[in-house]
Every structure is written in C-alpha cells, then in structure tokens.
C-alpha cells in the first residue's frame, strides 16, 4: 500500500477538484426561522401534503436553498416529529430525500380499494353545498394512481353520490366536465334557496 505525504495529498485533492465541474449553489436569501407552519407528526395524508406544500411555497418565496432548507427543516417540527427526525436525519442527504422520508413515514399511500371505499361511502349530505362536496370527492379521486379514470368516469362516480335535488335538475348526459357540473349545481342552489 502506497502512502502519500501531506503535500502530495493536498496536490492530489487540488487536482481532482480542478478536473470536476464547478457547481456552486446560489447563496440562500432566507431561512425557516420566521416560517409559522409546523408539523406535529400526525399520520394523515392531507396534513402531510398541506405541510409540504406550505413549506415548499415558503422556501421558494424566501429563496431558501435546498441545503439551507434541509438544515432548517427541524425548526418546523413539534412533538413526535422531532423525535422521528432525530432518528432519520442521517438518511436525508438532500431536500428531496427529507420530503420523501416525511411522506413515507407519516403519509403512507393508501391502497386504491380503500380510496374507492371512502369515495362511495360518502354521499352528499342534505345541507352540503355542491362546491364543498365535489371538492372533497375530487381530492379523494386525486389520490388514485395517475390516469386511472377519465373525467367522464369520475363524473359518473360523483354524480351518483349527489343529493337528488341536484340529479333531478341536472341530467347527467348534459354535463361533460366538473366545471359544468359545478356551474349547474350552483344554479340549482340559487334557485332552490
């Protein structure tokens, strides 16, 4: 085995550095120190998505680099999330790694059959407005694998779960998009109230 002197090692390292592309990250303009969003470690898909979306938006607006975001992420954790982070932080080499670890642990993907069960057991309640009902149902449909159903099929699912007052006033064959269904549903609400 060959050994290098300190001087040889220094020259070796400088040579390697000079051969590689210079990749400097732009200086970060901010940190998470003023971010008010917090995550407590609840195992809830929607809560995790909401947290990640808020943090990503804050990061972008404040110009926080991935490197600084990764360092500052623990500032946004409370409760069990703090304990969890202590155990996994070495596995998070990048910002993307950290977000994926967060999703994997606190927001495991539900199997499709469970999502379908949620969709079909949730009929529109009597006093629920059309906007709210369709929004909730579409959020559930969005959890299914990409491209599973076209809009026409998704409309069929949701139409069957709507209150009769909407179905009686809006023939299914007359609406081709969710936008049309919402517009027609709002008209029903204005004329029936």
UniProtKB/Swiss-Prot annotation:
Subcellular location: Extracellular vesicle membrane
Disulfide bond sites: none
This protein's UniProt keywords: Membrane, RNA-binding, Transport
Classification via InterPro entries: Ty3_capsid (IPR045358)
Protein function: Self-assembles into virion-like capsids that encapsulate RNAs and mediate intercellular RNA transfer. Arc2 protein is released from cells in extracellular vesicles that mediate the transfer of mRNA into neighboring cells.
Subunit structure: Homooligomer; homooligomerizes into virion-like capsids.
Protein name: Activity-regulated cytoskeleton associated protein 2
The species this protein was found in: Drosophila melanogaster
Gene: Arc2
């Amino acid at each position: 085995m060959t050994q290098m002197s300190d001087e040889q090692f220094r020259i070796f390292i400088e040579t390697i550095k000079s051969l590689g592309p210079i990749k400097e990250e732009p200086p970060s303009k901010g940190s998470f120190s003023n971010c008010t969003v917090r995550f407590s470690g609840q195992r809830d898909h929607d809560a995790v998505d909401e947290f990640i979306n808020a943090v990503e938006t804050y990061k972008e607006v404040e110009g926080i680099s991935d490197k600084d975001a990764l360092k500052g992420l623990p500032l946004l954790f409370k409760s069990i999330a703090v304990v969890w982070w202590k155990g996994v932080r070495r596995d998070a080499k990048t910002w993307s790694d950290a977000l994926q670890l967060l999703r994997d642990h606190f927001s495991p993907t539900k199997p499709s059959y469970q999502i379908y069960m949620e969709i079909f057991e949730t009929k529109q309640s009597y006093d629920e407005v059309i906007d709210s009902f369709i929004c909730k149902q579409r959020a559930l449909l969005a959890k299914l694998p990409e491209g599973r159903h076209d809009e026409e099929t998704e409309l069929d699912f949701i139409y069957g779960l709507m209150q009769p007052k909407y179905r009686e006033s809006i023939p299914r064959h007359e609406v081709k998009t969710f936008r049309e269904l919402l517009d027609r549903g709002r008209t029903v609400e204005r004329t029936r109230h």
